[in-house]
Amino acid sequence: MTQAVGLVGWRGMVGSVLMQRMRDENDFALIEPVFFSTSNAGGAAPAWAEGAGSLQNAYDIDALKKLPIIVTAQGGDYTSEVYPKLRGAGWQGIWIDAASTLRMADDAIIVLDPVNRPVIDAALKRGVRNFVGGNCTVSCMLMGLAGLFNNDLVEWMSSMTYQAASGGGAQHMRELLTQFGLLNQAVKPLLDDPAAAILDIDRGVLARQQDPSLPQEHFGVPLGGNLIPWIDKDLGDGMSREEWKAEAETNKILGRGAAFGTPATPIDGLCVRIGAMRCHSQALTIKLKRDVPLDEIEDLIAAGTQWAKVVPNTKEDTVKALTPVAVTGTLDIPVGRLRKLSMGLQYLGAFTVGDQLLWGAAEPLRRMLRIALAEA
C-alpha cells in the first residue's frame, strides 16, 4: 500500500528539481502525493501526477495533519509559520525540509544519507521526526570527501568557496544573466570592431558595472564580471553566517561535537559568490591526522560515495572535468587538484565541484523520503 505524502513548494526552483528527480527515479510509484499550494489552493495538480487531487491549502493545518510525511521546499518563512502550529496541533509525522530554519535544532537531523546513514537510522529509532537538508556547500563537499571524514583522517580543514548565483535563488540567477547581457550591450559596437582597443572596451564595461542603473536589487552589487566575498548575514565577529555553517553543519551531519560527546573537527574559511549559474566549487586545504600516501587518499575518496569522482591532477583533466559547466545537471561530485602541499606531508590540497540544486538541495530530500517510507 502506498503512503500519502504531502508536497509543499514543489513549483519553486528546488522543488522543481526535486519533482524531476522523483519522476526520474520512479518515486511517485511508492507514494500517494498530496500537492499543497500557498497561493493556488483548489487549482489543478501537475498534469504528470496522474490521479492526484486538486491542490490543498498549504496553510491548512487540519489538511496537513492527515499526512504521515510532509516534504517541503517552500522556504524558511513557510517553515517558521506552519511547522510550530502543526506540531502544536499534535501532529507526529515526519517533516522533511529543504529550508535551514530547523537545521540546527536539537530535535532535527541534517540528512545526507550516503555520508551519515547511521546517524539517520539511529535518529529514527529514537523517535526523531524532523529531517532537514544541509547547506548546499557543506553537502557537496562531504559527498566528495566522505572517504576522508569517515576514515577519521581530517584533523582540520579550510574551505575557500566559489558559490554560484543559484544559491541565492531564481531571481539571483536572472539578475546575473541580465547583468551579463547589459554589459555586453554596452560595448557591443566596440566588440564587433576588430580594430577597437581592448582597454576602451574594458573602460566601457567598468562604466556600466559602476552605473547605479545596472539591476542589482538581489545581490546588492554587480556580480557579472565581478565577485562578492561575503554570503549571508554578518555575525558581528568578522564571520558570515555561510562561513559559520561549514563547521557547525559538517560536524552535525557526521555526528560529532559536544552534542554527540565527541570532539568536533575544526573547519573554517571564506565564502565567495561568483558568476557561475548553479554549481558551487571549493578550494580545500586539509590537515590530515597522519601522512597518507596520495594514491591511498585517491582510493579512499573514490570509495567514499559512489558519486565522488577523482579527477587526475593534470591540466587537461582538470579544465575538462572540474568545472561548473562540466558538472551542472549531474550527480557527480568530482574531486581534483589533489596534491600534498609544501607545508608538510600531512597537508593536502583539493578542489571539488557540485551541483547546488542536486546534492546541494533536492537529492538528499528525495533519498530521505525513500528512507522515511519504510518508517512512517
From Swiss-Prot:
Binding positions for NADP(+) per the UniProt entry: R11, G12, M13, V14, T38, S39, Q74, S166, G167, P194, Q356
PROSITE patterns in the cross-refs: ASD
SUPFAM superfamilies: Glyceraldehyde-3-phosphate dehydrogenase-like, C-terminal domain, NAD(P)-binding Rossmann-fold domains
Keyword annotations: Amino-acid biosynthesis, Diaminopimelate biosynthesis, Lysine biosynthesis, Methionine biosynthesis, NADP, Oxidoreductase, Threonine biosynthesis
Reactions catalysed according to its record: L-aspartate 4-semialdehyde + phosphate + NADP(+) = 4-phospho-L-aspartate + NADPH + H(+)
Oligomer and partners: Homodimer.
Protein's name according to its UniProt entry: Aspartate-semialdehyde dehydrogenase
Species this chain originates from: Bordetella pertussis (strain Tohama I / ATCC BAA-589 / NCTC 13251)
Lineage: Bacteria, Pseudomonadati, Pseudomonadota, Betaproteobacteria, Burkholderiales
